[in-house]
Swiss-Prot record:
Has the structural arrangement of an alpha-helix connected to antiparallel beta-sheets by disulfide bonds (CS-alpha/beta). This is Toxin TdII-3. One of its GO terms (cellular component) is extracellular region. Binds voltage-independently to sodium channels (Nav) and shifts the voltage of activation toward more negative potentials. This toxin is active against mammals and also affects neuromuscular preparations of frog. Keywords: Ion channel impairing toxin, Neurotoxin, Secreted, Toxin, Voltage-gated sodium channel impairing toxin. It is found in: Secreted. It comes from Tityus discrepans. Gene3D superfamilies: Knottin, scorpion toxin-like. Expressed by the venom gland.
Amino acid sequence: KDGYLVGTDGCKYGCFTRPGHFCANEECL
């Protein structure tokens, strides 16, 4: 399932398909 995780730096790390596996997609809020 797709989703996103907001880091402490305020950036969104999204597009994870499996635990610990993230695509290279970052968006700073």
